[in-house]
Every structure is written in C-alpha cells, then in structure tokens.
Swiss-Prot record:
Name listed for the protein in its UniProt record: Protein translocase subunit SecA 1
Species: Corynebacterium diphtheriae (strain ATCC 700971 / NCTC 13129 / Biotype gravis)
Sequence similarity: Belongs to the SecA family.
Disulfide cross-links: none
InterPro entries in UniProt: Helicase_ATP-bd, Helicase_C-like, P-loop_NTPase, SecA, SecA_CS, SecA_DEAD, SecA_motor_DEAD, SecA_preprotein_X-link_dom
Entry's Gene Ontology BP terms: intracellular protein transmembrane transport; protein import; protein targeting; protein transport by the Sec complex
Length: 853
C-alpha cells in the first residue's frame, strides 16, 4: 500500500508544473475582463454555453471561464482567487483530488470548476459533509454563480420530492453524500417517471473527500422498512444484563468489539427467564437479544458512540464527531441501545435498498475532491476511485510549530495539565482550540474549565447547529473552543475572527440573506464586511503577537489523518500557530496498542502522576499503532468493496431493467417474453425425460392452473385430433399448444382493457404490475444475500474461499430471483384476466335476475 503511495507521488512535480502554467495563463487574462461592465461579464456565460453547443469542449473554455469566475468572485464577494486556488480548481476540473492545506480557501477554489462544468448543462454536484455546509456554500458561493446567470440548488434533509427535483435540475447542486445517495436509492424505487428527482451523475466535487470516500466508506447507505412483530425481548434483556458481571457472567474483547457469554452467564439468564436450556431450538433468538444487550452495556457508550436527544438514540460518527442523522445500527443493535436508555424502541427494519458510498460515487462520469489531508490515503483513493492526489502549494510559507507530545500516567493528571495550559494561554490573549475524541470528553473538560472560571464554547454533536458561529469567533483573543473532531472541517478559524461569517451573521440578524432578499443583502454587504474587517484586523494583530492559534489535542485518534486535520487548524495562510497533544496511559489508543509496557516503565521510574514524559518510544509506538489501524481499516474497506461488488453488479442489472420499464412507452414485448420464458420453463422441466407416459402432467397442469389457467386439460390435449393417437404428443407440441393458449388468453385481457381505457391503459397496468414485483423480489433477495454473507466466512473452515463461494451462490440466487420476477409478473397479470372475466359475467347475472323478478 505504502509502496504504491510513493509511486503515485513521483509524477506530482509534472502535474504541479502543468497546473501552475494554467494559473499563470488565467491571471494573464485578468486585464481582458476587469474593464468589462457587469452586464458584459454576465453575458460571457451565455457565450460559453453557445460555444459548447457548437462543439467546443469545457477544456477549450477552461482559461476564459476560470478568468470570468475569478473576476465575478471579486465583484460579488470581494475575494479574488490566488494562483494556488486556480491550480486547485484546475486539478478538480481534470478529475483529481486537490490536497490543499487548511485555510487555503477550498470553498472559493470550488467555484472555478463548478462554474466551468455547469456550462455543459448536465449538472454539477458539490458534496459536503453536513446540511449546514451545503446550505452555507449554496448561499455563499451561489452568490457568484447566480450573478453569472446559473441556477443553484441545495438538497437538505426533510425536503419534499418536488423541492429535491427542482434542486437537482439546477446547474449546480449542493448536498451531503447521504442525501445524494439516498435520493439515488429512492429514485430506483419509484413507480413513475414523474417521481424521479435526480437527472444523472455527470460531475461531482467532493469537499472533505477523505472523510466521505474513506472514513464513511465502510458504512453502506440503507433504506429500510419496518418488520412486523417487533420483539419485547429487548426490554427484558435490558433489565437482566445490568445485573450480570463482566468476567464472571460474560467476557468482552474491546479490541475486536465482541462479547462471549460464559456458563455462569447462561445459567443466570436461564434462571431469570425460568427456562431450562437457553440454546434449545425454541429459544434460539434469545441468544441474539442477550448478546446485543451485553454489547449495548459494554461496547456502546453514551455521549461517545451515540447521544440521546428528544428521546431518540442518535449515532455519533467516530471520525467527525457529528450526528449521523437517519442512520441506525442494524441487526437489533439500535433497539438494544434504545432499551438500555429506556426510550421508545422502534421497530426492527428490513433492507429495501442499499449501496455503499464507494459504489455510489463511482456512478459519476467525472469525480474530484478536496481535502487538506489526503497524503496518507493516496493509494486507496487511486485503487478504489482511480483518483490521483495532487498536493497544491500553500499561498504563504507555513509557520506552524508542532510541539512534542506530553504523556501522563492518568487521565485526571492529563486533564489537570490541559486546564493549566489553557489558562496560561488565555492570560496572554492567545486563542485556544481544544480537540477531544468524544462528546463525553468534551463535556468533562468543559466542567473542569467552568470550575476554573475560564470562559469557553463547546462544539460537539449536541450543538452542531452553532458550529459556524462558534468557529467564526474561535480566533478572537483569549477565545477557548472545546470541540470534537467536527471542528476540524468546513469553516476556517481566522485570527481576529472570520469576517465573512461574522458579517453574514450580522446581516441575518437584520433580516437579510442572499436567497430571500438578495438585492438588499448585496447592497449592505460591502459596508458591513469592511466594518467587520477593520475591527478584525486590529484583533488579529494582537493574536499574532500572542503566538497565533494554539491547538491542543487531548488524545490521539486511531487515524493519523484526523490528528493532522486538528493540527492543520493552526498556522493558516502563513499565520503563526502552535500545536501539542496531551496523552495519558489510559487513553483508548494507548490501552489498545501501547499496552502495559510504558505504564510499567513509568512505575519503575517512580514518575509522579502530574509529571509528563516526552519519549521517542511513545511517539513511535503511537505511530506504529495508527499505521496498524489504518492498514486494518483499509483492508476492511477493500473487503466491503469486494463483497459489495457482487451486489453492485446485480444492483446495476435490476436498476437498469427497472429504469427501462419506467421509461419505455411499450413493454408488451417484454411481457410476451416473460410468458414464453416462464411457461416454457414449466413445460421443459416436466418433459425433460422420457415420453408422454413418463411425464408428470398432473403436476404440470396444477402449476399451469396456478399460473394462468389453461383452457384445456392435459388429457384433452393428448386425445386431440391434431396430435394423432395417444403417446404421439411431443414436448415441442405440448410447449407450442400451452404457449398459444396463454397468449390467446392474454390477448383477450388486452382487448378488454383496451376497450375501456385504450392501449396506453394496458401498458400502464403492465408497468404497475411488474414494478412492485421487482421491488418485492429485490427486497427478499437483499435479505437472503445478507443472510448468505453472515455465514459465508465459515466456508474458510472447509478450505474454500468465502468470496468465491459468495460470488457463485449469490449469482445463482440472483438468477433465481430474476426467474421469480417473471413468474410472479405473469401470475399477477393472468389473475387480472380472471378478475375481468368474473366482472364481465356478474352484470349478466344481475340483469337476468332483474328480469325474473
């Protein structure tokens, strides 16, 4: 993996030179556009669109379009792209990952490729990590695009389909990876073209690409529906397990995140439930409830792995610290946690549709991304997404100082030292950003700071709505911001305060915003921004004199990249800054990987709790542990992809066929083929061997009766004049006769429907029958594939490759599912014919009865 990383970096020099040449050429065009009036500059958009219509490519227009968007950004936002931002924009346009340091202006960089590619009229998707950033960027950068005559849309949670459709039809659409992925799945569940919201996957720019394509790649997007008969056993075991004792009744492996019930535990549970054998067949489901209840107690911690808000258990992303809205643990785990927290236990769900982010983003014709920390994942981005990482130079030299880690014996001593350090920094007017790994730790530190009377803001999954306001002011003199990993993304910490965001907040407080009141907002913008900048410049100078932003990490993350993201908050745009990590021997990563060795050494040396050590051995051990976890996670993601590749190929077949049915005006030929295939398979199976005397025609006719209802019996066919004496009927004759009969009956159905509603009505009926059948069979297939995957690992014990077995059996199951779709569709359509026949007979009976009366 790391050898490939080195190889990928070899060609970076040439790529950077090429991008620098593009930036120089764009800047050389500046004079051509600065003299244009606003109307003349806006008219360039239509000119570019006309040139594309006449055969020019977006590559041909790159220099001019970038120059126009750059000038428009200056006129609208008061911000002009630096050469390095133009380089980043070009890297994105060519389908790469632009690695740009924190504070280098990735959001403004994105304006250039988004504008250029939107000129094609096929749609550009700008993907962010949360709704707030999607809305902010759509409003903020959308000001430039709208000024240039393009439409900008945003996809937010809880939007109605009509609103989503309008947003996707815009030239540029902002949204989160989850919303885009779920809309794709929902689009492949609709019953008519009018219900579709997306219009294709042309070009995507993924902000924080490492977070979305790497960190979240292990978790598939799942649309699920409730399963009937939710169990009360979750509550029962939520009362039993707290009375059980770890290492007596059960054991826990924190590293593997598994639990095992001991004999003492089994006996205890049997006694509590009043049963003789927990593992008896009739109690087999109880073991799963027990294991989940133990996991909920030992492995899933409130305010770390999840939070409880308004009576609902919400998952917290381990990497970003943000709430994963709409996500639920599967296999009953979420219900076990709900029972533990004594909130409403929601029904278990069955998967209706699913896709991994890896496979969703591979749908795009062109994909690109931005991040400040992609170097450690360059090989994975290349292997899975065919994305090359290009490091973009900083606009100014980096002056950040990264200090050595300090390691304490206990967490209490560590946090006491952290508070002392913060107090010292605040006294001299230096702003401090404190990074924590969980909601629980951030609130614990907040309590310590309150006791010391240190004013501070807390930014975690519970308060994510205030993220922009808190981060915008995190660079003010003496400001203290305690945050989970979420503060590492999306909004710059600017020394002296983020003038753009503070000005925007001030205008919104006056009732102005760029969407609802664009003219009034733009008219007030320049003066408000100038006022905030003037005040901010004075404060920024004070902060620089105090040493710039101080970033303090309270624990190492298992990913080096997350640590680097936190460090990257300091020293933006050439500002001074300092970073340091405070660790303890009881930190999760230290416990899991460094073990007792270091703690024993500290004890032998009689190191007091409040005295830290700075040892190269610790640093190396941490680096080794992080590398080990990264490799492990990479292998897990590759494994997920290998198995999902099987499902992905099947998904593409089903979704393609489904879309063709939706879009086709006439699927009569498809239905006729289904009748041929299904009935033909029935007959072929019954006549595979021997002669008429050997065929089980009774079973065949029962099956045909269930399927469509033949108008003649098997004996009538054998005795019929057309086939001569008994015993002379061939398999092909039988096949032909039954198919002719079926098609004749189907033609009668078509005549009846057409007489009432026209031919279009018949085609609609066929469509309305086949789509639910596909959805039902696909849903059942997903369940069966999940079941297959759960147990496939055991094949390794028989010296068989689980993946190969999964591919083979999954393929067989998929073919069986396709046959089942045909069979059920034919059955449903002929059932409709029978209903028509009954309906046609009923009026005659009624009429006759009336005459008799």
């Amino acid at each position: 993996m790391f050898g490939l990383s080195k190889m990928l970096r070899v060609g970076e020099g040439r790529a950077v030179k090429r991008l620098k040449k593009i930036a120089d050429d764009v800047i050389a065009l500046e004079a051509d556009y600065t003299d244009l009036t606003d109307e003349e500059l806006k008219a360039k958009t239509h000119e570019f669109q006309e040139r594309i219509a006449q055969g020019e490519s977006v590559d041909d227009l790159l220099l001019e379009a970038f120059a126009v968007a750059r000038e428009a950004s200056w006129r609208v936002l008061g911000q002009k792209h630096y050469p390095v931002q133009i380089m980043g924009g070009a890297a994105l346009h060519f389908g790469n990952v632009a690695e740009m340091r924190t504070g280098e202006g990735k959001t403004l960089t994105c304006v250039l490729p988004a504008y250029l590619n939107a000129l094609e009229g096929k749609g550009v998707h700008v993907v962010t990590v949360n709704d707030y950033l999607a809305k902010r960027d759509a409003e903020w950068m959308g000001r430039v695009h709208r000024w240039l005559g393009l439409n900008v849309g945003v996809i937010l949670a809880n939007m109605q389909p009509a609103e989503r459709r309008e947003a996707y039809n815009a030239d540029i659409t902002y949204g989160t990876n989850n919303e885009l992925g779920f809309d794709y799945l929902r689009d492949n569940m609709v019953r008519s073209l009018d219900e579709l919201v997306q219009r294709g996957h042309h070009y995507a720019i993924v902000d924080e690409v490492d977070s979305i394509l790497i960190d979240e790649a292990r978790t598939p997007l799942i649309i699920s529906g409730p399963v009937d008969g939710s169990s009360q056993w979750y509550s029962v075991f939520a009362q039993i397990v707290p009375r059980m004792t770890r290492d007596i009744h059960y054991e826990v492996d924190n590293r593997k995140r598994t639990v095992g019930v001991r004999e003492e535990g089994v006996a205890f549970v049997e006694d509590q439930l009043g049963i003789d054998n927990l593992y008896a067949p009739e109690h087999s489901q109880l073991v799963s409830y027990l294991n989940n209840a133990i996991k909920a107690k030992e492995l899933f911690n409130r305010d770390k792995d999840y939070i409880v808000r308004n009576g609902e258990v919400l998952i917290v992303d381990d990497f970003t610290g943000r709430v994963l809205d709409g996500r639920r643990y599967n296999e009953g785990m979420h219900q076990a946690i709900e029972a533990k927290e004594n909130v409403e236990i929601k029904n278990e769900n069955q998967t209706l549709a699913t896709i991994t982010l890896q496979n969703y983003f591979r749908l795009y014709d062109k994909l690109s991304g931005m991040t400040g920390t992609a170097e450690t994942e360059a090989s994975e981005l290349h292997q899975i997404y065919k994305l090359d990482v290009i490091p973009i130079p900083t606009n100014r030299p980096n002056q950040r100082e990264d200090m050595t880690d300090l390691v304490y014996k206990t967490q209490e001593a560590k946090f006491a030292a952290v508070v002392d350090d913060i107090s010292e920094r605040v006294t001299k007017g230096q702003p401090v950003l404190v990074g924590t790994t969980s909601v629980e730790r951030s609130e614990y530190l907040s309590q310590l700071l309150q006791r010391r009377g240190i004013k501070h803001s807390v930014l975690n999954a519970k308060f994510h709505e205030q993220e922009a306001q808190i981060v915008a002011k995190a660079g003010l003199p003496g400001a203290v911001t305690v945050a989970t990993n979420m503060a590492g993304r999306g909004t710059d910490i600017v020394l002296g305060g983020n003038a753009d965001i503070i000005a925007d907040i001030n205008l919104r407080e006056r009732g102005l915003n760029p969407v609802d009141t664009p003219e009034e907002y733009e008219a007030a913008w320049d003066a408000e921004l100038a006022r905030v900048k003037e005040k901010g410049a004075e404060l920024a100078e004070k902060v620089r004199e105090a040493g710039g932003l101080y970033v303090l990490g309270t624990e190492r993350h298992e990913s080096r990249r997350i640590d680097n993201q936190l460090r990257g908050r300091a020293g933006r745009q050439g500002d001074p800054g300092t970073t340091r990590f405070y660790l303890s021997m009881r930190d999760d990563l230290m416990v899991r990987f460094v073990g007792q060795t270091m703690e024993n050494m500290m004890n032998r040396l009689n190191v007091p709790d409040d005295v830290p050590i700075e040892a190269k051995m610790v640093t190396n051990s941490i680096k080794s542990a992080q590398t080990s976890v990264e490799n492990q996670n990479f292998e897990m993601r590759k494994n997920v992809l290998k198995y999902d590749e099987v499902m992905n190929e099947q998904r593409k077949v089903i979704y393609t066929e489904r879309r063709e049915i939706l879009e086709s005006a006439d699927i009569a030929a498809d239905i006729q083929k289904m009748i041929d295939d299904t009935i033909g398979a029935y007959v072929d199976a019954a006549t595979a061997t021997g002669y008429v005397e050997d065929w089980d025609l009774e079973t065949l006719w029962n099956a045909l009766e269930s399927l469509y209802g033949p108008s003649f019996s098997a004996q009538e066919l054998i005795d019929g004049d057309s086939y001569g004496e008994s015993g002379e009927l061939s398999a092909s004759d039988l096949r032909k006769a039954v198919l002719e009969d079926a098609h004749k009956q189907y033609a009668e159905l078509e005549e009846n429907v057409t007489a009432i509603g026209g031919e279009a009505q018949m085609r609609n009926i066929e469509r309305m029958v086949i789509l639910p059948v596909i959805d039902t069979k696909w849903r059942e297939h997903l369940y069966e594939m999940d079941y297959l995957k759960e147990g496939i690992g055991l094949r390794a014990m028989a010296q068989r490759d689980p993946l190969v077995e999964y591919q083979k059996e999954g393929g067989d199951m998929f073919n069986a599912m396709k046959d089942a779709v045909k069979e059920e569709t034919v059955r449903q359509l002929f059932l409709l014919r029978k209903q028509f026949a009954v309906a046609n007979e009923q009026p005659a009976e009624t009429e006759e009865g009336t005459v008799e009366a």
